[in-house]
């Protein structure tokens, strides 16, 4: 999707010092209208960038917390309209600006708000209003930030070889915000925006204090599991009982742990029932676990159907059903193994654990 720039404001941000002692300043270089932008060097610099920003895929509930591209929604209290949100008002007013002077004044609010965040970096801050060349004539607002690139040089001459380039920028790791969000070409969501920041630092999204981002799928699954387990336990134990207090202590540790061990609180039916709620929302939800030193990865939907867990003489056993077994790189005698019957294997496990 191609865009025509209506207005574009160009700011340079300079930061001296670090953390709370940092001196943060900005300077407005120019605000361009359509004709001025078409004649400027920025046209080539940004060629194809707006299209790239719009085409970037994003999920309302991403697969991890650290995805570079997110969909955010303006926080609105029940019974209130979008215009009760300060961040929405900033974007909407910039989107509707009709003159270069108005756009310049409105875009400056974004820069000033950005400078109030804790981890500002020097660079170029661009605010643009643009209209798609097809589908509709509504404006979009794009915020783009290019950090200054260190150690950039150009070839000079045979004697000095290179010369350092000050305040060099590139679109390679450019951060961006697009408003409104366009889930499909020709369709917009007035209450949502899309933000992209390639680094793991979250500072670029921090200056939009009244925008929230959807929980990641792992976080949603974790919360659903927590609710389901708590519901089961509260039905099982009496209020203020020692068992309930111990459970609440254990669940706090479980929630905060990166690596967690099996809790042995629910039976197969209860786990399948709880999993069904997650699978209904996300059919491709994954199940990952480590049995001893062996990693197992499959679909949550397969648990209780083709993925099973059992205990034999106090030791854990994983059972996996499949029509085929395939091998990847490397080779081993196991590829020529003729599998035994299940009962023989279980009997061997029993005998081994009894001997141990």
Swiss-Prot record:
InterPro entries linked: DUF3898, DUF3900
Gene name as annotated: yetN
Taxonomic lineage: Bacteria, Bacillati, Bacillota, Bacilli, Bacillales
Superkingdom classification of source: Bacteria
Protein's name according to its UniProt entry: Uncharacterized protein YetN
